[in-house]
């Protein structure tokens, strides 16, 4: 009998506990469900059902804060209520920091921000929000330190990080030191190129070199950019770094077309079309393994400039461009010419027409005072004659350029 009574008592207690647990689970579940609502009434209901639901209390505080419903004291109390349930809730500390700075309590805002800072670890979203608050408080160092982590963790935010850094900090050295990690350096270099901040690129490139250097794609993009800005000396140094085993002292790179052109930097740019084909001839050549062959289809009166290379020169100096060329059955009087040009300047050879065996030619020119680079290449100008559909083949090999003598200044 006693055992039975004991059993019944234990069963009753367990039943009561189970009912209580179920009720608590239901209450907690309903509160949690309401806590995800953007409706203030449902959020208030969630807090009434379960005051321990820190998420619900925070969301209610945040909603009142953003919509400016109720006074700051009530919103502040809600933030603190959420923290009483979870003191490590970084979003509540950030909310307090923003509330305080909005109401002019900068010291309290900074204290709350520091509390949040110690709890965020490496969350990009929270660090981003913290950065914005730090900027408002004038703590640029903290803001940039946070943005450094954001840029490293979230590639999609890197451009915004760099934009904000330049908008707020303005000092390139500070931005590079505090907001740009080694991992982000290539992306930052690309950003500086896109936004045309030439002076700021040099320390970035130097730091890249100290950390193993950039890949060839980034190096080529930077070399192209520097050439476009007129800094051919640095661009040539970068080019030499891409091809450390090659002789980069020659003014014309890959003059024998022994390597497939990359189409960037100081290498050849070779384009093809339906009417003009470009390939390499391993049998017809003057030196090395192959020559460049151009073949015109005879279907079009082309205006063509499909082979070119940028060459660094000293403005005001004299140069001689030499090459070997041959032709076969090139029709029309407007044949193929070799040309050198830059802004407002052009020198060109006599056109190649008909058929001719290999022959050496030379073109001398003086680099204009405003041209740190010239472009050398092949050209076929569109013809205005009735017989204008060009066909035939042209070969080019052993292209070289040498400096002859500097221009002498004229007497006054």
Regions found by a protein language model. Give the residues of each.
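Structural marker of alpha-solenoid helical repeat scaffolds
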Residues: 49, 85, 119-120, 153-154, ...
């Amino acid at each position: 009998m006693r055992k039975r009574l004991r059993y019944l008592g234990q069963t009753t207690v367990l039943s009561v506990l189970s009912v209580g647990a179920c009720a608590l689970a239901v209450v907690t579940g309903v509160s949690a469900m309401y806590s995800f609502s953007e409706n203030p009434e449902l959020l208030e209901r969630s807090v009434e059902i379960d005051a321990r639901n820190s998420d619900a209390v925070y969301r209610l505080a945040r909603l009142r804060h953003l919509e400016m419903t109720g006074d700051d004291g009530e919103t502040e109390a809600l933030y603190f209520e959420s923290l009483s349930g979870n003191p490590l809730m970084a979003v509540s500390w950030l909310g307090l920091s923003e509330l305080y700075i909005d109401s002019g309590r900068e010291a309290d805002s900074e204290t709350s921000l520091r509390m949040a800072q110690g709890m965020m670890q490496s969350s990009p979203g929270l660090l981003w929000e913290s950065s914005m608050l730090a900027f408002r408080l004038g703590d640029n160092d903290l803001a940039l330190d946070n943005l450094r982590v954001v840029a490293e963790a979230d590639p999609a935010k890197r451009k915004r990080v760099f934009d904000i850094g330049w908008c707020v900090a303005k000092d390139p050295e500070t931005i590079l030191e505090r907001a740009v990690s080694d991992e982000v350096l290539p992306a930052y270099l690309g950003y500086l190129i896109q936004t045309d901040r030439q002076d700021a690129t040099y320390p970035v490139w130097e730091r890249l070199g100290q950390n193993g250097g950039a890949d060839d794609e980034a190096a080529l993009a930077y070399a192209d950019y520097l050439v476009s800005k007129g800094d051919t000396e640095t661009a040539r140094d970068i080019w030499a770094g891409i091809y450390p085993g090659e002789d980069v002292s020659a003014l014309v790179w890959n003059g024998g077309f022994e390597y497939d052109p990359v189409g960037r930097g100081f290498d050849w740019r070779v384009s093809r079309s339906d009417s003009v084909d470009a390939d390499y001839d391993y049998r017809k050549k003057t030196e090395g393994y192959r020559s460049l062959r151009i073949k015109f289809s005879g279907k079009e009166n082309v205006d063509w400039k499909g082979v070119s290379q940028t060459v660094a020169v000293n403005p005001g100096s004299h140069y001689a461009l030499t090459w070997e060329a041959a032709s076969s059955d090139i029709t029309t009087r407007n044949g193929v010419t070799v040309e050198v040009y830059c802004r407002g300047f052009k020198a060109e050879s006599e056109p190649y027409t008909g058929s001719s065996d290999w022959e050496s030619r030379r073109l001398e020119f003086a680099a204009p005072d405003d041209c740190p680079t010239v472009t050398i290449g092949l050209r076929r100008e569109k013809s205005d004659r009735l017989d204008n559909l060009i066909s035939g083949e042209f070969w080019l090999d052993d292209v070289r350029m040498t400096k002859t003598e500097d221009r002498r200044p004229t007497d006054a």
